[in-house]
């Protein structure tokens, strides 16, 4: 298992997915909270 060239790509891809997923979940959560507070 000496895949040194695939490992950094997987790491960058993992960081990119989480870097986009975390703000998206937080953004959707804040929108749902605003909708709930307004009503």
Swiss-Prot record:
Heme binds at residue 18. Keywords: Chloroplast, Electron transport, Heme, Iron, Membrane, Metal-binding, Photosynthesis, Photosystem II, Plastid, Thylakoid, Transmembrane, Transmembrane helix, Transport. GO terms for molecular function: electron transfer activity; heme binding; iron ion binding. With its partner (PsbE) binds heme. PSII binds additional chlorophylls, carotenoids and specific lipids. Its cofactor is heme b. Coiled coil: none annotated. It holds the Pfam family Cytochrom_B559. The keyword ATP-binding does not apply. The chain crosses the membrane at residues 14-30. Its main location: plastid. GO terms for biological process: photosynthetic electron transport chain. It is found in: Plastid, Chloroplast thylakoid membrane. It is a single-pass membrane protein. One of its GO terms (cellular component) is photosystem II reaction center. Heterodimer of an alpha subunit and a beta subunit. PSII is composed of 1 copy each of membrane proteins PsbA, PsbB, PsbC, PsbD, PsbE, PsbF, PsbH, PsbI, PsbJ, PsbK, PsbL, PsbM, PsbT, PsbX, PsbY, PsbZ, Psb30/Ycf12, at least 3 peripheral proteins of the oxygen-evolving complex and a large number of cofactors. It forms dimeric complexes. This b-type cytochrome is tightly associated with the reaction center of photosystem II (PSII). PSII is a light-driven water:plastoquinone oxidoreductase that uses light energy to abstract electrons from H(2)O, generating O(2) and a proton gradient subsequently used for ATP formation. It consists of a core antenna complex that captures photons, and an electron transfer chain that converts photonic excitation into a charge separation. NCBIfam families: cyt_b559_beta. Belongs to the PsbE/PsbF family. This is Cytochrome b559 subunit beta. It comes from Cedrus deodara (Deodar cedar). The lineage of its organism: Eukaryota, Viridiplantae, Streptophyta, Embryophyta, Tracheophyta.
């Amino acid at each position: 298992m000496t895949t040194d060239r695939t490992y950094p790509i997987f790491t960058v891809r993992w960081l990119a997915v989480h870097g986009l997923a975390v703000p998206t979940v937080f953004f959707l959560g804040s929108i749902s909270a605003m909708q709930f507070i307004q009503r």
